[in-house]
Amino acid sequence: AIKIDELSKYCKENKIKAIGMSDTSNLCGSLEFSEQISKSKTQPIIGSQIKFKFNDIIGSLPIIAKNSEGYKELINLSSKSFLENTNLEEPHCNIELLFKCSENLIILSGGINNLSGSLFQKDRLDELEKLYFSLNKNSGDNFYIEIQRHGDVNEKNFESFNLSISKKVNAPIIATNEVYY
């Protein structure tokens, strides 16, 4: 785990221009992160891994605010994920809600433990392809297919799939790393 003050110091020492943080299901750490990182003259990038329902699967998608309007949309999505589920299901939004408010958001496909990874591991590749096409179509140029390398046995095959499908979907690849603070 990385402490935010240590991360801020690292950013300053290494003249890092921007760094992002993505909370899980909420934005509770975004204020502290933004304040600390800004002290190092580094641009904070705020995101959240919000759960969405696609067909019958519920899983997270990393969402990043492009600007202040995007930050408001993140707050809205996070709040609705908790407020609009009246039964005992885990907090989530329907994927169509994301499509309606994606203009000021960057959407990542997620790793092996996210919504897309769940579809991949269940061998529901046609549905995963439809999800990627829908995310790309409804977000303009703001959808990125994610690859990660954490040593998970399924990541290598998932990476190969994502590299291949990115050309078909016409979505760029982004390499990310899950770090916890």
Identify the role of each PLM range.
Residues 1-181:
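Phosphodiester-processing cores and adjacent nucleic acid-binding clamps
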